[in-house]
Amino acid sequence: MPWIQLKLNTTGANAEELSDALMEAGAVSITFQDTHDTPVFEPLPGETRLWGDTDVIGLFDAETDMKDVVAILEQHPLLGAGFAHKIEQLEDKDWEREWMDNFHPMRFGERLWICPSWRDIPDENAVNVMLDPGLAFGTGTHPTTSLCLQWLDGLDLNGKTVIDFGCGSGILAIAALKLGAAKAIGVDIDPQAIQASRDNAERNGVSDRLELYLPKDQPDAMKADVVVANILAGPLRELAPLISVLPVEGGLLGLSGILASQAESVCDAYAELFTLDPVVEKEEWCRITGRKK
């Protein structure tokens, strides 16, 4: 069915209150959108982190009388009469199908392909990871995931143990297993990520070699030959004492989810225990790798 969208601009501080106002006026869903394409860094647990200049978008049933909606919103103290807004009709689409149609197989490095589970494999002789991301982060399309996949593809993982810290969809752990790792361990704070990783591991026939944990359940003595963490700069800095003990002596570390402008501060958090390689950048993001001293 078609929908009507009402968009208004506000500050991040007022976005939640105006979201409530739109819902009270009859919106069936609310979306927050950055007005200026500004990066948003990691929120605190339970916090919705918003941009300084935020578009609040309400979605309404096509039969809604938007004059009535606007009249209700004009009564809100943050808006008032004649408040700036934009109303447009959205065409009827199968949004999930459109997303699926735009997700294609992607190659990383020399051997590795990430393939949507609903697509044909482009190269039967390659290392193919069949992926359905579900609600978890990690499809290979983001520069940070791409940087990590390229790094893993260039390693000799045969017989190695790999930890994927912040595993999301499981893409990095599963890729490592398909590239020859004997065992992988995925850790994530989100139960949906654990389930997505489990489903994708089964789809790729590697579930017997993948262990998955919420942080509260992970083994105390967890160690690996290779540790990869594609999260964000803040957690990477804060969790450096925890992440640094995961690689064995001489083990490898790969970090991403880091803006290039944040690389120096993340490197500083790991330089004492690791011999770090030159930072690799892609678009505005980067990857930091090193070897445990």
From Swiss-Prot:
It is an enzyme of class 2 (transferase). The keyword Transport does not apply. GO terms for molecular function: protein-lysine N-methyltransferase activity. GO terms for cellular component: cytosol. It is found in: Cytoplasm. GO terms for biological process: methylation. Belongs to the methyltransferase superfamily. PrmA family. Methylates ribosomal protein L11. This is Ribosomal protein L11 methyltransferase. It comes from Salmonella arizonae (strain ATCC BAA-731 / CDC346-86 / RSK2980).
